[in-house]
Structures are given as C-alpha cells and as structure tokens.
C-alpha cells in the first residue's frame, strides 16, 4: 500500500515517500510525513503498521540525538543503520516485534553519501538504490535500467519522476502525492512535492 524510494548519487542521496495514511481500506489523510530526521545529515524513512512506524522511528530518533548530546558528535549513517538494525532485531525476538520497513539515507564527511535498505526482519543492506512497498515490484526494474553511480541530481529527479509515473500507470491503488528530500554535505533539503491528478478526476 505504501511506497518508499531512495537513489544514491556521487555526493547526495535522493529520497521520496508517499503521503497517504490509511487504515485498512480507508484513506485517513493525504499529507502524512513518513520521513524522520535522525540528525543534521541522516534521514529515516519508515512504513509499516501505523503505530509501529511512529513508535519505532521516534525511539531510534531520540536515541541517536541522545548519543550526540552525550558524546558531542553525531553517529555516521553506517553506525546509525547498524544501531537501528540491532534494535529492530532485538524487538523481533521479543513479545513486541515492530512490523516496519525502513530506508536510511545520510551523508558523512569521510564516507560520503549512504543509502541503507532494511526490512521488518532486520535484514540490512547498503544499496545504490532501493524501494519498499508493492510499488517496488514495478519500479526496481526502471532503477536497474537507468541508474548510474555518477547520476546527476537533475537526472536523479527525472528518474524518480519516471518511477512515480509508472506507479500511477500500473499500480491499482491511488498514491497522488510524494514528499521528496535530498541529503548532501550541507544537510537535508526539501524539494517540491511531486503530485499527480487523482484517478478519475
């Protein structure tokens, strides 16, 4: 039902998520933000069960911020991804597992940009591009065909739009609006939302 996508470039990571909050077959709102700011240069995108997503993402968010307050410096994207994975794995083996799928995007002065894919079973993988949700079945082939490691920001936005247009054409559910952000050495930047006219209007 939900959709996340991330594309890593040579000096940035471009991410997008749909803005629909749904309960069963009912759309509750169409301006829901599924991105959580971990630190100045790390963004966590989270989809899954409605209560689990916010509770787990905010728990990770507060702990990453607590780490900075205690130590005087921020976690790198790699460290944040491994911390998130460990917590998700521990919860999976408890009586209160979280059913969440995640993308973690960030930029580090030494390592450069990074994009991590994580599923609800706490499987973690570093990837040049990634997607979550049923829409991933329709768009991963497009990313595989057109992605290059040296892709410019403009081309990455075009590729993102191509994926979202394919989603509108072939996905049976209505996801009309997407939040888009980019993470680079200067931090997290909001780009214009990508919107499509509602089907049948």
Swiss-Prot record:
Q: Which InterPro entries match?
A: Ntn_hydrolases_N, Proteasome_beta2, Proteasome_bsu_CS, Proteasome_sua/b, Proteasome_suB-type
Query: Where found in the cell?
Result: Cytoplasm; Nucleus
Establish whether keyword Nucleus is in the entry: yes
Set out the biological process GO terms recorded for this chain's protein: proteasome-mediated ubiquitin-dependent protein catabolic process
* Expression induction or repression: Up-regulated in ovarian cancer cell lines.
Residues with the modification N-acetylmethionine, per the entry, are: 1
A GO CC term assigned to this protein in UniProt:
membrane
In terms of Gene3D superfamilies, this protein maps to: Glutamine Phosphoribosylpyrophosphate, subunit 1, domain 1
Could you tell me the keywords of this UniProt record?
Acetylation, Cytoplasm, Host-virus interaction, Nucleus, Proteasome
Q: Which family does it belong to?
A: Belongs to the peptidase T1B family.
Subunit info?
Answer: The 26S proteasome consists of a 20S proteasome core and two 19S regulatory subunits. The 20S proteasome core is a barrel-shaped complex made of 28 subunits that are arranged in four stacked rings. The two outer rings are each formed by seven alpha subunits, and the two inner rings are formed by seven beta subunits. The proteolytic activity is exerted by three beta-subunits PSMB5, PSMB6 and PSMB7.
The protein's job, in short, is: Non-catalytic component of the 20S core proteasome complex involved in the proteolytic degradation of most intracellular proteins. This complex plays numerous essential roles within the cell by associating with different regulatory particles. Associated with two 19S regulatory particles, forms the 26S proteasome and thus participates in the ATP-dependent degradation of ubiquitinated proteins.
Protein name (record): Proteasome subunit beta type-2
- Naturally occurring in which organism (per UniProt): Homo sapiens
The encoding gene is: PSMB2
